[in-house]
Amino acid sequence: MAFHGIREVENYFIPFLQRVKSRNEWKKINASIIIHGLSQSSFMVTKMVDFCDKIEDMDYATRLFNQVSNPNVFLYNSIIRAYTHNSLYCDVIRIYKQLLRKSFELPDRFTFPFMFKSCASLGSCYLGKQVHGHLCKFGPRFHVVTENALIDMYMKFDDLVDAHKVFDEMYERDVISWNSLLSGYARLGQMKKAKGLFHLMLDKTIVSWTAMISGYTGIGCYVEAMDFFREMQLAGIEPDEISLISVLPSCAQLGSLELGKWIHLYAERRGFLKQTGVCNALIEMYSKCGVISQAIQLFGQMEGKDVISWSTMISGYAYHGNAHGAIETFNEMQRAKVKPNGITFLGLLSACSHVGMWQEGLRYFDMMRQDYQIEPKIEHYGCLIDVLARAGKLERAVEITKTMPMKPDSKIWGSLLSSCRTPGNLDVALVAMDHLVELEPEDMGNYVLLANIYADLGKWEDVSRLRKMIRNENMKKTPGGSLIEVNNIVQEFVSGDNSKPFWTEISIVLQLFTSHQDQDVITNNNALAFIGIV
């Protein structure tokens, strides 16, 4: 076939490139393109690089690009985009530097979004700010897609100031602009600012609502997370799998079983149970809400279990004190060739701790380090020390506190203190208490624990001294509380709090309940210590 000019040849091959489906077809077309002398055509090579991106053959894309003597900005953008899609961020930076150094062309509005994403993925704030400077110098500064990518980059660097500055200076904002800023604030736990921004938004999408739910869950404000979940539904927005995964931990922490069951049915109806993340969150919710049988059933029905699935089930067994269930699940995990992680071993150690299986605890701790090269964190040391202390192996537990690579925290010293109620362990108790006074000077519970130990030993002068210290320091116990779920709404009641609506009526009902309960009679001094009265 005779062609008149390079453009006609290019136009001839474009439909073939658009229809190609297999690598064999692609190779034949590519050979024809080279035969017709188009290896230097930036236009044709751009199309070929785009196809390489689609089939994830970046080695060939690189060879095609390198053959072109003078690539234009469209070809540069194509190879930068392809490298970004395939997570080759260092190559993105290399090509960008080549564009600045060797090309007569400048980066444009299609270049910068991929550059900002690559800098963020590399975690290089320095590079990101340099590219931002290039945008101000070369690029069309006020372009919403570019500025959205810039906001997202700064948010990933936890740079709220620069992110908000870009947002404030935008000529035009779209819903992605708002959601990028909102999601960043929520991810960093800045929920007051996130809420203010949320209420300014005219177009709230599922992404906006999910960011708020996830943000509140992340900082432990579980009631607020569930409130936003309900408000989202009242606003007519149906939850997706991400919003379900975001709210289920709040259900788990608050014991909101009814809402959790509703989410399970909703997820089943919408086909979300095919998503491993949704099933993992449901297993955790059922475990923490006390319905371990439902968690086991759901786990058994899952396909494609990942390490989180196995670890969540192991932790569920541990939460219910079923060490044998946790160990058997771990054995199944090994047979399934799924590599455990630190969370897996934390669940195993916790399970061993609940039932005093200290030898198994030591074995799993050693297995974690030696077989899987997982460096124990302070939580792992805490569980190991707890299992040894509960089993009466205090000397070994104390030895670990001296040799562990990080300073023991208050949980570790508290675990040691609470295990010192047998005779002969007063010295360990006093050492633990010294550290607790330093770490938690106002925690009355630690003084109560020590007073219990003194009471067990008949050291009533020391009990009296501690009682005087508590009064002089004006220490107060953290008030007890309880949660109750009615009509899918969780209500929290805290000791001494009379701010609830209908508090008078509630008090009358509570008095009726207590009047029918048997009154326990305290018959000896030791009982005073056991119920926390010092």
Swiss-Prot record:
Q: Name one GO cellular component term.
A: mitochondrion
Where do the record's region annotations for Type E motif lie?
412-487
Q: Where is this region: Type E(+) motif?
A: 488-518
The segments carrying the PPR repeats are 41-71, 72-106, 108-142, 143-173, 174-208, 209-239, 240-274, 275-305, 306-340, 341-371, 377-407
* Disulfide bond sites: none
**Origin, by domain of life?**
Eukaryota
Q: Which GO terms describe its biological process?
A: mitochondrial mRNA modification
Recite the UniProt keywords alphabetically: Repeat
Pfam families the record matches: E_motif (PF20431), PPR (PF01535), PPR_2 (PF13041)
Determine if Cell membrane is one of this entry's keywords.
no
Q: Which InterPro entries match?
A: E_motif, Pentatricopeptide_rpt, PPR_At4g14850-like_plant, TPR-like_helical_dom_sf
- GO molecular function per UniProt: RNA binding
User: Would you identify the family this protein belongs to, as annotated?
Assistant: Belongs to the PPR family. PCMP-E subfamily.
Write down the NCBIfam families for this protein, in alphabetical order.
Answer: PPR
Q: PANTHER family annotated for this entry? A: PENTATRICOPEPTIDE REPEAT-CONTAINING PROTEIN (PTHR47926:SF415)
The entry's protein name is Pentatricopeptide repeat-containing protein At2g20540
Q: Which organism is it from?
A: Arabidopsis thaliana (Mouse-ear cress)
As recorded in Swiss-Prot or TrEMBL, the protein's gene is named: PCMP-E78
